[in-house]
Amino acid sequence: DGKIYLSHPPRSKPADILRFIREHLDWIARRARPQEAALPSPYADGSTHWLLGEPLRLRLAQDATRDIHHAGDILITAPGDEAALAAAFRRFHQQQSAAHLPAMVAVEAGRCPWVRALPPLRYRAMRRSWGNCRRDGILTLNSRLIQYPPALIAHVIIHELCHLQEHHHGAAFYALMQAVQPDWQARKASLERFRREHGVLM
């Protein structure tokens, strides 16, 4: 299970146990490495990936290109090391974001009376946020969002559109969120739950 267990005589002193551990750290590290190496790659053949909340299976084919091809419930790409496959998925998420998110933003903007024109959109992989809204009106959405169900993507879009009106997270901002998307708190919780349960990257 990847854990290292230490057994010792019942009367061992804590200081003696700690000294033993310090003296054998190199040995412990060597023992732990095989467990780390055994962890499956997230890009292994047959692994599950997500697009708009739907599960897709990855197939690594020798005659495929480096770009990811979407065919039904299968994603096809050429084999490669983990870095190359991660880069291929970043490109795929960018492409799918550009294909799907503008229409979703247009729908959600229709629920926001203060949005008179669709804001400029950008997409990029972000590790710490789902999106951001600049004061000049440019919306940037996390390209990894394209993995999530549309209702959860809509929550992030509404959040950023509300920032066009309220550039903060104060009471006025949340009042606006509540007016436009009354179930926003449930959607926010579902977003985190989906990420946690399915191991989907932020």
Regions found by a protein language model. Give the residues of each.
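Active-site-proximal or metal-binding-adjacent scaffold patches in catalytic folds
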Residues: D1-H155, L164-M202
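Walker B catalytic acidic pair
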Residues: E160
